[in-house]
């Protein structure tokens, strides 16, 4: 076998590490992992909205119903959350030593986009103030809190000790 063939067909090192491994992941692997982790983070937000609704907290903020759990309504927030996991995958290596803090704060990125782009485009105004006033804005911050930390927890569980 020539040197080129041996390089082409050489067994690639194991790069995903789970809980205990010390291997490193590539950028594409981190992005893919964080897409999946973001989707799980989105599921946490949807389930948290149902919890807040069941506890009566949503009504105090003027929200009348949580995100439906039936198809196809549930897929949109999961897909968008997965997309928001991609930038987290790009940032995960430099913030690895403070991953959970970064995850906790990362929920602000999609919330800021929601407040300044998506809500105004939907007619709810900047920060959703035309839809329900400041209480609606506060509710959106509250309901989205689980996104970043859940994304970080899931990414850490899949990647292991070293990104």
Show the residue positions of the predicted features:
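Juxtamembrane/disordered regions of integral membrane proteins
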Residues: 2-163
């Amino acid at each position: 076998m020539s040197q080129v063939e041996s390089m082409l067909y050489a067994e690639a090192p194991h790069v995903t590490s789970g809980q205990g491994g010390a291997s490193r992941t590539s950028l594409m692997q981190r992005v893919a992992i964080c897409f999946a982790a973001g989707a799980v983070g989105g599921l946490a937000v949807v389930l948290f909205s149902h919890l807040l609704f069941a506890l009566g907290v949503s009504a105090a903020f003027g929200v009348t119903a949580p995100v439906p759990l039936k198809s196809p309504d549930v897929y949109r927030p999961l897909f968008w959350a997965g997309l928001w996991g991609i930038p987290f995958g790009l940032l995960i290596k430099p913030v690895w030593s403070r991953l959970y803090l970064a995850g906790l704060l990362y929920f602000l990125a999609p919330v800021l986009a929601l407040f300044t782009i998506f809500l105004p485009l939907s007619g709810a105004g900047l920060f959703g103030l035309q839809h329900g006033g400041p209480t609606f804005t506060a509710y959106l911050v509250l309901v989205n809190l689980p996104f970043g930390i859940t994304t970080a927890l899931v990414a850490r569980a899949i990647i292991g000790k070293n990104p």
